[in-house]
């Protein structure tokens, strides 16, 4: 399988800027135009997904997911296969992976072009008393300055610009859900990182996706369905927090938006975006793409 996963990675990297995380599965024509051979495609089509629907228990975080209509849930092993073998993410990026949601018109791994990655961070109870006091415009300006500063140490072609909020951060106080999206601009195009955080008493469930800017409206239309699909078990919801017994997190809502724990919350690196560490976001997408191509094509030449 590993040989074909490498081929898949080459295809995805080569075609990514043409079909950036679209909700439409890759067609045979798309894959042929990206360089996959008819023989390889035939074999890769045999690597079918086993998606689940209905209510699925997420025992690792004492929660469950009711799979939204129009989607399939891929369990942790299949999610790792997609994210690591097919999309060439480092395995260490997904220590807390629960699964992924993919559109239900996908049949095999290679044709999946977008996924909502679900992870859990056992970081403790995050207080939301700063929800109404955060100036997100000021936060954006700070982050943009950090991007500019970081770009100074990167080659011009590898630089990334934080254009702004695609979806302004907003917190649903009644359901304890934090949502935002930001647009990142690379020399080859733009991507949108879409983030949803569902808070519980012991930590948070994160739903993340990297999407085409043109598909943001579609994600927004599914936003409520996505977050409502996750529910914590009795005794583990946000309202069940007991200060005498439960751990309080050092994180704040503002810290989550700033990117303090992005390294733990499953941001996809499908497009060459590396997982981000600590609060200072470092975007090196072009470097990842170039390195991935060199590694994959280098491996191919060696085998030949």
Language-model-detected regions and their locations in the chain:
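Bacterial N-terminal signal peptides that target proteins for export
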Residues: 1-10
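Short, aromatic- and cysteine-enriched interfacial helices/patches
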Residues: 6, 31-32, 296-298
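Bacterial N-terminal signal peptides
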Residues: 10-20
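Conserved polar/disulfide-associated segments of primarily extracytoplasmic proteins
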Residues: 28-64, 72-193, 235, 247, ...
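Short aromatic-glycine motifs in intrinsically disordered, low-complexity regions
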Residues: 53-66, 214-224
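Extracytoplasmic/lumenal ectodomains and periplasmic regions of secretory and membrane proteins
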Residues: 185-249
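C-terminal single-pass membrane-anchor helix
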Residues: 248-304
């Amino acid at each position: 399988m590993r040989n074909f996963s490498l081929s898949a990675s080459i295809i995805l990297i080569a075609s990514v800027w043409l079909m950036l995380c679209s909700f439409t599965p890759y067609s045979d024509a798309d894959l042929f135009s990206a360089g996959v051979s008819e023989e390889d495609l035939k074999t890769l089509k045999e690597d079918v997904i086993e998606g689940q629907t209905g209510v699925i228990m997420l025992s690792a975080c004492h929660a469950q997911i009711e799979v939204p209509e129009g989607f399939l849930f891929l369990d942790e092993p299949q999610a790792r296969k997609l994210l690591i073998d097919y999309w060439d993410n480092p395995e260490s990026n997904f220590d807390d992976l629960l699964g992924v949601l993919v559109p239900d018109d996908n049949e095999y791994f290679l044709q999946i072009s977008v996924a909502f990655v679900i992870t859990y961070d056992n970081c403790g109870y995050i207080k939301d008393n700063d929800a109404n006091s955060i100036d997100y415009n000021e936060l954006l300006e700070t982050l943009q300055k950090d991007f500019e500063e970081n770009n100074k140490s990167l080659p011009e072609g590898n630089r990334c610009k934080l254009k702004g909020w695609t979806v302004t951060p907003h917190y649903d106080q009644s359901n304890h859900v934090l949502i935002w999206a930001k647009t990142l601009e690379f020399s080859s195009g733009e991507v949108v990182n879409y983030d949803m955080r569902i808070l519980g008493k012991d930590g948070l469930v994160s739903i993340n996706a990297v999407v085409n800017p043109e598909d943001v409206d579609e994600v927004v239309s599914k936003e409520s369905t996505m977050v409502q699909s996750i529910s914590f078990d009795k005794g583990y919801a946000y309202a069940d927090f007991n200060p005498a017994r439960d751990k309080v997190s050092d994180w704040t809502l503002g810290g989550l938006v700033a990117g303090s724990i992005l390294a733990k919350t499953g941001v996809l690196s499908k497009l060459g975006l590396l997982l981000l560490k600590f609060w200072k976001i470092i975007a090196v997408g072009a470097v990842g793409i170039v390195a991935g191509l060199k590694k994959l094509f280098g491996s191919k030449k060696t085998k030949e």
